[in-house]
UniProtKB/Swiss-Prot annotation:
InterPro entries: Ribosomal_uL6-like, Ribosomal_uL6-like_a/b-dom_sf, Ribosomal_uL6_a/b-dom, Ribosomal_uL6_bac-type, Ribosomal_uL6_CS
Keyword Ribonucleoprotein tagged: yes
Top-level taxon of the source organism: Bacteria
BP-aspect Gene Ontology terms: cytoplasmic translation
Keyword Kinase: no
SUPFAM superfamilies for the chain: Ribosomal protein L6
Biological function: This protein binds to the 23S rRNA, and is important in its secondary structure. It is located near the subunit interface in the base of the L7/L12 stalk, and near the tRNA binding site of the peptidyltransferase center.
Taxonomic source organism: Leuconostoc citreum (strain KM20)
Assembly, per entry: Part of the 50S ribosomal subunit.
Lineage: Bacteria, Bacillati, Bacillota, Bacilli, Lactobacillales
Designated name of the protein: Large ribosomal subunit protein uL6
Cellular component GO terms held in the UniProt record: cytosolic large ribosomal subunit
Record GO terms (molecular function): rRNA binding; structural constituent of ribosome
Amino acid sequence: MSRIGNKVITLPAGVEVSQEGTVVTVKGPKGTLSREIASQISMSVEGTEVAFTRESDDNKTKALHGTTRANVANMVEGVSEGFTKTLKLVGVGYRAAKSGSKLTLSVGYSHPVDFEDREDLTVEVPDALTVKVSGISKQRVGDLAAEIRAVRSPEPYKGKGIRYEGEVVRRKEGKTGK
């Protein structure tokens, strides 16, 4: 039994869910998202509730049941509220700047690292040590935030690098002298 797959999704005001074949489309105040779902999973919309059922009880279908429900729930949340990931730059001389459609990171390399804006995401730099990535697709927001973090991920000795807000970096002790 998939406990997550059996939960119904309650639609907020202004959000519509429709299905054509295996493609689910979610429309809301912030935009529209579409995703293909597995053919073994069927979706039913009744009023403001969306429910998912599976055609068999084999392990792969059970896994797809919960995953499909979670993906559609994230789409509903994205088109109604949106998603935001905040990154913090920790280190002497580390800074971020936004000029036009380009994010520039100075994080200790001999050259600045540039990121072009993605069409469906917004990147803000409220101050030189903070970068906010926001959009309607949880996956796309997380992917871009992970790409930015991978430029200089936090190191365990001094904790310098780019980290998610609230991320705890496990620190190590340095070598002890003779």
